[in-house]
Each structure stands twice: as C-alpha cells, then as structure tokens.
C-alpha cells in the first residue's frame, strides 16, 4: 500500500504565524534603523566637536588633511627633517617617500625607512602629491584653553550660579506646588490657570522692565539678578511638581495629621521623600538651563568680567580666536562635561519623571 507523500508547502493557516513573525521582525528592524538615523543626526555635532578639539591647530590649515586627528609625517635625512608624501611608483603602486628636493618638473625622494639608499628622481610636480598622515591625538588644546580662558574661575562662577539658582527654584517650586496640590482656597483654579499662562509669555516682554528694576536697585554687575528671581516659583516647575504631588494618596496626609504632623511636616516627611523622581527632574531641568544661560549673564555681568560664566567667556574667546576652531571646540567640550556627567548620574530618576501626567498611579 503506497502512502501519499506529505506536501512540503505550508498551508495558509501555517503560513500565518510565520508571516506575522517576519512582519514583526521587519517592523522592529525598520524602527531601530530609523532611531539610529535620528541618533546619528543628533550625535554628529558632538562627534565633530570631539574630533576637532583633538586635532593640532596646524592640521586645520593644511589642504587635504584627514578628518580624524592626525599629524603630517616627517623623516630625517642627513640631519635635516623633510615631509613625507605618497608617491606613485612605475608599477602602479604607491609608496611613502621623503621629499628632499622639490621641483616643478622633477623632484627627489628618499625612502624614509632606509635613508642610505640612493635618492629616487620622480618626474612630475610634487604639489600634486598627497601628504602622508599618521593618527595623533593632541591634548594641548585643552591645556591652552584652561590657562588662556581662566577656566577654573569661569567654572566656579558658572557652577555657583547654577547651584544657587537651582536650590532657589526647587524650594520655591515645591512650596507653591504643595499649596496647589493639597490646600483649598478661593480662586485656586483660576490662579493656577494664570500661573500656567505665564509659560507662553515671551521672555522679551519682561526683559526690559526687570532690567530697569534690577539696575535701579543696584543689582547690575552682581549675581543677584541671576539667583533671586528663581525664589519666585517657575510655572513649569510648579506644574510638574503639582502633577506628581496629586498622584500621592491623601490617605498618607491624613495618617500623618492624626499623628499630629503639621502641613509643613507632612511636606517634609511625606510628600518630598515620595517625590524624589519629580524633584530630580526639576533640578536637572533648571540646572541645565542655568548652566547654558548666555543672555542674562551677558546682560547683567558685562561690566564684571571676573564674575562672568562659561558661555559668555567662550563667546569672548571665540571673537579673539575665530581662526582657531580647535581651541573653540575644546572650550565647548570642557564646558559641557559637567552637565553630561550630572545627567548620566541622575538619568534613572530623570527618565522616570519625563513621562509624568495628571493620572494617579
């Protein structure tokens, strides 16, 4: 009795899961590729900054120099130093040779690996040849910026202003957000709407009035205009903290009140310990804003160079060394080092908080 051979073709029902798995894999691969492309676009300026800051200043002035940090190769012949070029050989290959006697029609080269050999006469203009380069990282740009820019002083100014203003912003934001989240008083909702409306208020609208006020009270030329205004809560910080405070059950407040805790004690012992992710996010947001702020320090500290921050100092440094991109990029890279380190140390709490909504947990 003969049996019918089993068909190797998958039925429609069998092909369904396979097709779905391939479709799911293709969707994930496409999403990953698209995300990598976007990431590359954002990382390209950073890669340019790192690459340029590690190059020797002379490399930027040589035509045909590589994009990576490198130094032009040189060799010694009879006690003198000569550049090395990539020379085409008669057999079609290329070889690195040391140019000892340049000429328009004929040039003399010597093998840099064996200078005792007879010099080679090459027919052609040496200017058409490519110079030989070797990978080389130059850290002198950072030491130059450190000394010329008075970097330690500018770093101290920037850190002091950023830390003090961040402390002021976090304290004021927590107090105001706690009032909107836990207390009942007439006009609370209207006041909160007005507070949120200040987010869309252009910065230029309040710039001139605040500048006139701070100048008349003698704050111009000091750090006070960069710190004191943050004692009056920022609307964005209040909104973010209030939404998080609302997600904390009121039962905890009532339990603390039964034990005799005051409203301030509830804030300090119940609300704040449970709101570490939100407070961390507000701290990072404001710290980065204050660290990168350029206009306000320029406006209020222009008469006091010793009190200026790094962004303002880098702008002045750029005007002096506009033809030295390696120094400018080194200064920018050194300036962004602190925010990058701070972000990576607190990225866990930060990423948990950026998705906060008004929905209770």
Predicted regions and their residues:
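Low-complexity, charge- and small-residue-enriched intrinsically disordered regions
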Residues: 2, 14-15
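A structural signal for multi-pass alpha-helical bundles of membrane permease subunits
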Residues: 3-9, 19, 23, 31, ...
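Anchoring transmembrane alpha helix of integral membrane proteins
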Residues: 13-14, 30
């Amino acid at each position: 009795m003969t049996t019918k051979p089993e068909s190797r073709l998958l039925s429609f029902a069998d092909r369904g899961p396979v097709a779905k798995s391939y479709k799911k894999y293709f969707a994930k691969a496409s999403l990953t590729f698209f995300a990598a492309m976007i990431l590359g676009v954002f990382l390209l300026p950073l890669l340019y900054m790192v690459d340029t800051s590690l190059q020797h200043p002379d490399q930027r002035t040589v035509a045909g120099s590589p994009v990576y940090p490198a130094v032009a190769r040189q060799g010694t012949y009879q006690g003198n130093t000569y550049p090395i070029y990539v020379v085409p050989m008669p057999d079609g290959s290329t070889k690195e040779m040391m140019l000892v006697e340049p000429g328009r029609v004929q040039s003399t080269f010597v093998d840099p690996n064996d200078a005792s050999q007879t010099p080679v006469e090459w027919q052609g203009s040496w200017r058409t040849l490519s110079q030989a380069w070797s990978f080389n990282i130059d850290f002198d740009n950072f030491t130059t910026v450190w000394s010329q820019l008075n970097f330690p002083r500018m770093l101290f100014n920037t850190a002091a202003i950023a830390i003090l203003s961040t402390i002021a912003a976090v304290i004021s934001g927590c107090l105001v957000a706690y009032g909107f989240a836990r207390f009942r008083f007439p006009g609370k909702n209207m006041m909160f709407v007005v507070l949120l409306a200040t987010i869309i208020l252009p910065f230029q609208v309040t710039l001139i009035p605040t500048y006139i006020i701070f100048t008349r009270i003698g704050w111009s030329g000091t750090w006070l205009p960069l710190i004191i205004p943050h004692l009056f809560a920022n609307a964005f910080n209040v909104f973010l903290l209030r939404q998080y405070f609302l997600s904390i059950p009121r039962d905890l407040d009532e339990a603390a009140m039964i034990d005799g805790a005051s409203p301030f004690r509830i804030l300090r012992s119940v609300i704040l310990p449970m709101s570490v992710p939100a407070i961390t996010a507000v701290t990072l947001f404001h710290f980065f804003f204050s660290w990168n702020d350029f206009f306000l320090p320029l406006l209020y500290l222009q008469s006091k160079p010793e009190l200026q921050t790094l962004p303002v100092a880098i702008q002045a440094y750029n005007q002096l060394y506009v033809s030295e991109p390696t120094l400018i990029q080194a200064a920018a890279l050194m300036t962004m080092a602190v925010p990058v380190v701070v972000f990576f140390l607190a990225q866990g709490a930060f990423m948990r908080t950026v998705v906060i909504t008004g929905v209770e947990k």
